[in-house]
Amino acid sequence: MIKILTISILFNFIFTINKILIPMDDSQTNHLKAYGVAFSSLEKQNKVEWLLNYRGGSFIINLDNSIKRECLLKNVLFETLSIEKISVIYSMLEQENMELVILDKTPKIAVYSPPNQQPWDDAVTLALTYAEIKYDVVFDDEVMNGDLYKYDWLHLHHEDFTGQYGKFYRYRNQNWYKEMENTFTKTAKKYNFDTVHKFKKTIAVKIRDYVSKGGFLFAMCSATDSFDIALSFYNVDFAHSIYDGTPIDKINISNVDFENGIAFENYELYTDPTIYEYSTIDYPSSHQPTTRSAESDYFTLSNFSAKWDPVPTMLVQNHVTNVNGFMGQTTGYNKEFLKSHVLILGEDLYSSQVKYIHGNIGKGTFTFLGGHDPEDYRHFVGDPPTELDLHRNSPGYRLILNNILFPAAKKKPKKT
């Protein structure tokens, strides 16, 4: 639960501290760097007030010269607040479907990414770099050594936890593919695994354990469904012989345990290495043509009670309700295969596609967002990274940055 400060408590300090409002509605000149300003304030040990559903999820920050200078340098719009204006804002928060959440810590952020250069971008590292938010890069060695527990928040992107090398078999003669294959095989042997798929499944289990003990997991694209598949099919060899030299275990492939997965169930696998798809989870499927154009592809963010459901409300803060869709190896999720406890944050109201989901695992949480890059509708292998200065008000990238601030929220003491 999130600690919600009442109006009476708030008035104890608003009279003595100058504050600025960073609006997050259509008036904002740079939404993405605004998150960086909020994060920077937390790094200076200054609390940030996140106004859920007020002008697109605006921030109130204590005014000092460094924050003001940062806003000016980053072209982030801010408004100086008077006591009267603050009073009006807090009164509105109390009366409307709005809420105030205190952000009071700087989340330690890790991005799971291989050491070798991959021929595609990562939307989260692009967002973090553009917003000037610090993060560390971790990979399999750090996971095996227990280093994940140094971090509050972990991101997974275009990764494959099934040991099928991203199902990029068509690129098997490319140098980057050969390097990936060689690196993964060496690392698996280093930890006494005879196949990459057994090793990668173990990595998925360790990440799940990290989340269940209180970690925050945010994943996009193929890292979402391949992660869940690795957990559910942990004891089944479904990797084609071209990957590990052994045939698919067709006898035991039905011995799936969907209880081990965190988000999906009752789906079927695609084991053919020439099909660029893991399972029937993905919707629409990557290997089947779609007639939808980029102009007509969008998903709708769900509406929640800010006072009763502050967590999902935080995750959907935006200046728009309908967000442009974007494709990926895993573009979205077939609603048919969602577990009952999974909360839908965004979906296509006219099809079976769910785009954005959230759930709990033990003491931690996970959030999955389908698609590869919110501002590159069809991101292909070898395409250059997206230039975010051309998309500084991107609604899709805002969803990523909402997840960055989510772990900073102050916890509410449990009632006795």
Residue ranges and their predicted role:
Residues 2-16:
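Sec-dependent N-terminal signal peptides
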Residues 167-303:
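A glycine-rich, often tryptophan-bearing local segment used as a flexible ligand/cofactor-contacting loop or short
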Residues 17-122, 371, 378, 413:
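Hydrophobic targeting/anchoring helices
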Residues 92-97, 141-143, 351-355:
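Alpha-helical scaffolding within the catalytic cores
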Residues 119-122, 129, 225, 236, ...:
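Catalytic beta-strand/loop cores that center a nucleophilic Ser/Cys/Thr
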Residues 102-105, 146-149, 210, 337, ...:
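Extracellular/periplasmic catalytic domains that process cell-envelope and extracellular macromolecules
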Residues 17-23, 29-60, 237, 335-416:
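Extracellular ligand-binding/catalytic regions of CAZymes and related secreted enzymes
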Residues 19-20, 25-29, 64-69, 118-224, ...:
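Helical hinge/lid and interdomain linker segments adjacent to catalytic or ligand-binding clefts
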